[in-house]
Amino acid sequence: MEELILGVVQGLTEFLPISSSGHLAIFTAIFNATPDVGYFAFLHLATFLAVLIFVKSEVFEIVNGISKKDKEYINLASKLVLSTIPAVIVGLCFGDFIESVFSSTFLIGVFLSITGILMLLSDKLNKNLKTIKSIPYLDALIVGIFQAFSVLPGISRSGTTLFAALFLGMKKEDAVKYSFLMSLPVTFGAGILELQKVAFSTEQIFGFFISFLTGLLGLYLVKKMVIGGKLKIFGYYCVLASFFVLMFL
């Protein structure tokens, strides 16, 4: 039953800017269980499939553009690769430390409050100047650096990347697309690296499919909320969740 609940939690919170890793760690603490980082990573593969389906048209355009040697799409692909490098470096170099943070509900509570503040600020950012094709390489790197911090439970990957993209002047819909596209190699890599630690029980496999389905729901919801300027709702939620974690866990 725990695996199924964690599958729902992962699917819904992976793309909502409220930190899936933080919520997985919180629910693990509520269940009084040892954090299973391997299973958490396995669930990332489920949400990887969900986002791949959600942005399939954009992925096809990029692949097709690269095959035709279209400079515009080659540059976009290069920027996406650049955006993933900081998270890869942090994940490989500080993996043991990151795993230890999953057991610290205090740090998770603090990081959730940071995510909440970023979301409250995001709704005030509305420059709407740049598209995913027009952002400079420096912007791509900055968004990638923000993503690197999201390896910490409580820091939302979608939240930090959306905040960074909007702060740098990207259009809302393009910020959502870029955030989802740059999540593909990170979530896939996280899942593959820890795959050998997964027991592949019936409950875990079912949790995988539940995470996939709820991930699709989360994707549609966050796109609607970002475009509608309602990220502050997630901000208030994260602040309240932070208070709960710090006071009761």
Swiss-Prot record:
Transmembrane segments: 11-31, 35-55, 80-100, 101-121, 135-155, 180-200, 202-222, 226-246
Single Gene Ontology MF annotation: undecaprenyl-diphosphatase activity
Pfam families in alphabetical order: BacA
Enzyme Commission number, as recorded: 3.6.1.27
Enzyme's top EC category: hydrolase
Any single Gene Ontology cellular-component annotation: plasma membrane
Topological type in the membrane: Multi-pass membrane protein
Major place of residence: membrane
Catalytic activity: di-trans,octa-cis-undecaprenyl diphosphate + H2O = di-trans,octa-cis-undecaprenyl phosphate + phosphate + H(+)
Localization (cell): Cell membrane
Keyword match Hydrolase: yes
Keywords: Cell membrane, Hydrolase, Membrane, Transmembrane, Transmembrane helix
PANTHER family (UniProt xref): UNDECAPRENYL-DIPHOSPHATASE (PTHR30622:SF4)
Family: Belongs to the UppP family.
Function: Catalyzes the dephosphorylation of undecaprenyl diphosphate (UPP).
Descriptive protein name: Undecaprenyl-diphosphatase
